Amino acid sequence: MSAEPWICERSPVKDSFQQALDQTLSILTRIKDDFGRHPTVSSESLERLKTASTHETRPLEAAPDEGSGDPRFEREFAGLREATLACVKCPHLARSRTQVVFGVGNPHAELMFVGEAPGADEDAQGEPFVGRAGQLLTKIIEAMGFRREDVYIANVLKCRPDMPPGVSGNRKPTPDEMKTCLPWLEKQIEFIKPRVMVTLGATALEGLLGATTAVSKVRGRWLDFHGIPIMATYHPAYLLRNQLVTEKRKVWEDMLQVLERLGRPISERQRRFFTKTEL
């Protein structure tokens, strides 16, 4: 594909200047995509840019999130995190894990992604979705017009499922493990109050809703979790195993529904991702 949106390496925002630069480049790219030409700039503006680095700059102030800056919220959410990190409800997982993987992102996010359980990379780093599947998830999030830090990402199971000694890889969480750990996720959702949630893979769907069904049977239509609309879609690991454009398009169609539900703008280029016109 010539316009594959999920193959670009993600550059982390290091400071406020980089954040502003990334946002500016994103806006300029959208202008080009929507109008079919590069935006123009006057020679006077270019001269100003040449001398801009000589002036003292102040860090950009991020726009406050709804509910951010509430000391009580921050204290209680931090308390939930600490309690989760200390959990030993599954003794076998408490013994085998490197650390509990609580979740990451904006605790006031309007969009929340839920996976099944940490893998080896996540267990080592203490953050969900940081391996190859996580890198693909980040690209999907960015193709939607978000930054990874704008959304919230968590798993049904907070500990990596244990493996027999000498055996590599990851295993699926058991129903009992997910049932035991689910209250932690439910409390996270209660705090975050996302407008929309996305479950990634059949195991996450089972762990959150108790639905033992194939994702192919339910994807593309809205489900419900205590009044929060849920879109079930394939796990990014599935897309790594199955590189068919048709499968990528299915996931992207699910994400387009999410964007529409959130009232987010969708460019014509975004609507064409993984279609014949983009091949």
Regions found by a protein language model. Name each.
Residues 5:
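Cationic, low-complexity basic patches in intrinsically disordered or flexible, solvent-exposed regions
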Residues 13-21:
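Intrinsically disordered, low-complexity regulatory segments in eukaryotic proteins
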Residues 22, 26, 30, 37-279:
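A polyanion-binding, active-site-adjacent surface
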